UniProtKB/Swiss-Prot annotation:
InterPro entries: G3P_acylTferase_PlsY (IPR003811). One of its GO terms (biological process) is phospholipid biosynthetic process. The lineage of its organism: Bacteria, Pseudomonadati, Pseudomonadota, Betaproteobacteria, Burkholderiales. It is a multi-pass membrane protein. Keywords: Cell inner membrane, Cell membrane, Lipid biosynthesis, Lipid metabolism, Membrane, Phospholipid biosynthesis, Phospholipid metabolism, Transferase, Transmembrane, Transmembrane helix. The keyword Ribosomal protein does not apply. The gene is plsY. It comes from Paraburkholderia phymatum (strain DSM 17167 / CIP 108236 / LMG 21445 / STM815) (Burkholderia phymatum). PANTHER family: GLYCEROL-3-PHOSPHATE ACYLTRANSFERASE-RELATED, INNER MEMBRANE PROTEIN YGIH. This is Glycerol-3-phosphate acyltransferase. Pfam families: G3P_acyltransf.
Amino acid sequence: MENLIVAVVAYLIGSVSFAVIVSAAMGLADPRSYGSKNPGATNVLRSGNKKAAILTLIGDAFKGWLAVWLTGHFSAHFGLDDTSVAIAAIAVFLGHLYPVFFRFKGGKGVATAAGVLLAINPILGIATLLTWLIVAFFTRYSSLAALCAAIFAPLFDGFLFGANVIALSIVAMSALLIWRHRANIAKLVAGQESRIGDKKKAEAAASHKH
């Protein structure tokens, strides 16, 4: 019963889409209507509003961190263990991907996964974030950076901690993240993927809104 509650609470936390909420609060176009149509920080950046993108990034990462941190923090009080943490990790991630509050149409989970990893272990989270930053810096492809980070995250976890139940949730998150980027993979291969900072499509969408 405790793990079921953990799953439901974590999923609901994950279902809060900061990309949509922040954009609406700041009078911007719905991120699901322009660019990649993905409600995430990278696509919000295409609106040209860096503050909105940063707030989205922080919010999506925070909810991932919060769900896992709460589970660990209250583990002693409610008899929770690493299995509970693993459940919280995948549940909050699924909430972001398929949010009940937004017709189950969510983002791709990069920032939320980063928050989850930081909560599981700061070193694991930082190593994965550095992987994303290095690839993104040299290629300006957010999607390629995310794919590389998704591949390396389980490897970092295995190197740091060996076989453990939480690793299963990390592998599951990585697999889902790669699956959610399947269209991006096709665009990367075709040389048609948008780079970080590309906001032409967003500006067109915003002008149509007014």
